[in-house]
Amino acid sequence: MRTRAALLLALLAAGPIAACHPSASESSAVSSAPPPREAAPPVTVVGPGRDARTPEADGGPDEDASAPTSAVSLTDASAAPPPGMRLVPGGEFTMGADAGGQGDERPAHRVTLAPFWLDVTEVTHEAYAECVAARACRPPDPKILARFGGVFVSPRRPVTGISWADARAYCAFRGGRLPREAELERAVRGDDGRRFPWGNEPPTHERTVFQTSKTDEVGAHPSGRGPYGHDDLAGNVWEWMEDLYDPLAYTRPGASRGEPGTCEEILEAQRRLRAEGKQGFTGSNPIPTECERSIRAGAYNYDADGLRSTNRVHHPGSFRLLMTGVRCARSPG
């Protein structure tokens, strides 16, 4: 019987099979340039105010940007956790920041959430390969993973090179869903409003993966765990969120429930912000011209400020990036 590692390598070598949510543009090659020959990528540290987009992004749409966010169940959370998950308690917490962040992190406001289960770690190549083998997910983009000699590909490293639709399909395969922005921030901040998962102390390389050139195996930095026992909530890879990215989400009527505006409302807000010249309003990306998806949790090539619990970043859902992966959530009941 083949090991999971062997299965992973075989699947990556085989290339795309059955797409989860394909479109003509999404199934095209991401980049025609051959991968670099160096053993590891150079360290390019990114932080708020710098553009996090990279040339390895897939350019075509592969999602319905108006798709509704998943509802959070209010049922009892006292049952045993699903495998590989830990409970994030329900309740009220402070989301956002009034100072020390970007415009899209304001204002700080109270949000009430139901309890939910969240993966302890980011999804690994090993785990994602099982979904590909079941023909429920398409493989990660092979051209992305081949970059820098394939150093990002090993069974226990977080899977990357997947789009928002790929991430969503994987979580559905597991019986779960993508987390919402408010849920991820709740998992990081806990009840004490901490700046980072481990507290308010600055990041170190013992606690997390940042300011470096590649990912690490999931769970390799236990001193950086969050308040509810989750690993790598800041650093290693960005994680796709269910939500549409809304730069004015915290001023919307649904802010107390962690709900962004509709795509139409978001496009109008983006148009207004661009007209006002507020291109630096949205952290690590310029103000978009389409409805994009939120990503959270920081990445290996980001600086310390980019790992803050309130930092918000966004990309088109079709992008498949070397630094973006997934972590799944599930509502009790």
Residue ranges and their predicted role:
Residues 1-26:
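Sec-dependent N-terminal signal peptides
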Residues 4-9, 102-110, 147-150:
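Short, flexible, solvent-exposed loop/turn segments with mixed acidic/basic and small polar residues
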Residues 19-78:
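Ser/Thr-rich, Pro/Gly/Ala-heavy low-complexity intrinsically disordered linkers and tails
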Residues 79-144, 160-165, 187, 234-235:
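A short glycine-rich, aromatic-capped structural motif
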Residues 88, 94, 98-99, 145-313, ...:
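Functional-site microenvironments in short loops/helix caps that host divalent-cation chemistry
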Residues 321-333:
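Short, structured beta-strand segments at or near domain termini in extracellular proteins/domains
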